[in-house]
Amino acid sequence: MIKTILVPTSGSGTDRTVFATALALGRTCSAHLHFLHVHFVPATAAPQVPQIEFWPGPVVYDALDSLRQQGEHLSAGAHRHFEEFCQVHRVEIRDSPGMAEVVTASFSEESDQPMTRLLSHARHSDLIVLGRRRNRDHLPARLIDTVLMESGRPIVIAPDAMPRDVASTIVVGWKESKEAAQALGAALPLLEKARRVVLLGVVEQGAPSRSAFDDLARQLVWHGIDAEDVLGQRPRSGGAR
């Protein structure tokens, strides 16, 4: 059961669709949304600036000062976006569970070893909602990959457009692997609420056979999920020789 959703907030314009996606997911399971702003100080954000190590000293100083100001601006934006979100959607702010089965929210900010702290929060959550990285938000270039591979938790990537319904149709890309099994298990609460579930697989070396695919579909039936299955053939690369 998904009851806690981590929502990293950048303080930039990407927050809008990330927050909307998190709210839509939260409403499907009355979850608590923990909004986390990772405040990257200049020393941490500087590596995101291309070739900064080759810049002359005075230029680097000005760049670091600019990064500091941008960081403060994003921090203020993250706080503001959170407060506006809770006010507009009437989401109760609280740090501990209440009696009512409703969406609640909390906010925190980390600046000391930000990526380490972000991963720690991610591992202690049931689900993470992330936005696509933009250069202006100071987030690491491989944030999504890092959280996916090192948190051990499922992630949802918010779309660029405002989502209307996050659980209408869910496509499951399946491969016979430990990672796929773990991801499917973590996603079961969402699959159980979806109106349509599609199992997608490709026949290749190490991929599921038809019998394995059918067995997976039967397993989902035990959870009340009547999934459609699409098992295709991977086209051969390259032309005839």
Q: In which residue ranges do the predicted regions lie?
A:
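Amphipathic coiled-coil/heptad-repeat helices and related helical stalk/stem segments
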Residues: V18, S111-P114, P140-A141, A180-A183, ...
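A short helix->loop->beta-strand "cap" motif at the edges of active sites that frequently abuts
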Residues: A31, Q87, R153
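Conserved active-site and cofactor/substrate-binding residues in soluble primary-metabolism enzymes
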Residues: H73, G77, R142, Q182, ...
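Gly/Ser-rich helix-loop-strand patches that form or flank binding pockets
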Residues: T14-D15, F19-A24, T28, F107, ...
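Small/aliphatic-rich secondary-structure junction motif
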Residues: M1-L64, E150, R164-P235
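Structural beta-alpha unit
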Residues: T4, P42, V49-I52, Q69-I128, ...
